[in-house]
Design a protein with these regions (language model features):
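Periplasmic c-type cytochrome electron-transfer domains
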Residues: 1-215
Length: 215
């Protein structure tokens, strides 16, 4: 759940590396927080209000006004390059949409996309201890992907173009748990540019410029 996910970046050593109880202690000094926490979650401890309220906010972060969305709903157009990139994205030639499908361009699964360096982070294996999970990470949404560099779970790829080049050659790491769909695609530079153009249409400026999300 999102409530559980909230705990990860707070406590993970390579993210915030902090302690939820220390956050609770600090927030107890804030009379407004204490008042709102009791009002909203009267039967729960303050630390519950922290995770529950952050998760509630995260559920409001819905992006659905990109150029692609307008095109899909008959309210806008894509140019030829973007349209050809869209056709490639949803084609059997690339299989991009196999993992990055649906409204949020993710199937919410875990997968090894050939970017992992096992010695630094073994992925889902850290939790399950199943060898089949070595190098598997959550498939991310591609909405607003043009704005979220650097890419991959470890930030090892600096640009969207480099990501596409990596997939085109079948990944950067041939680990044995790599998804069977990650293989050489043999796309031309022109086709890679078309894919990148399509991915840029997933940017939702109404979402990213919403003043409610600035803080």
């Amino acid at each position: 759940s999102l409530e559980i996910q909230v705990l990860v970046p707070i406590q993970e050593h390579n993210e915030f590396n902090f302690n939820l109880l220390k956050i609770e202690s600090r927030l107890k000094q804030d009379s407004y927080f204490v008042h709102m926490a009791k009002k909203t979650y009267p039967d729960n401890e303050p630390y519950f209000a922290i995770t529950a309220s952050i998760a509630s906010f995260e559920r409001t972060l819905v992006s659905n006004q990109s150029r692609f969305d307008y095109y899909l709903n008959g309210l806008g157009t894509l140019n030829d390059q973007e349209r050809l990139g869209m056709e490639l994205f949803f084609s059997a030639k690339t299989n991009c949409s196999h993992c990055h499908g649906g409204f949020n361009f993710t199937d919410y699964s875990f997968s090894n996309n050939g970017a992992v360096t096992i010695k630094n982070d073994s992925g889902r294996y850290r939790i399950t201890h199943l060898t089949s999970d070595i190098g598997q990470f959550k498939v991310p949404s591609l909405r607003n992907v043009a704005l979220t560099a650097p890419y991959m779970h470890d930030g090892s790829i600096g640009s969207l173009k480099e990501v596409l080049v990596s997939y085109n050659k079948g990944g950067n790491n041939k680990a044995y748990t790599q998804n069977h769909l990650i293989k050489e695609l043999q796309l031309s530079d022109k086709e890679l540019a078309q894919l990148e153009a399509f991915l840029n249409t997933l940017t939702d400026y109404n979402f990213i410029q919403n003043p409610k999300f600035k803080h």
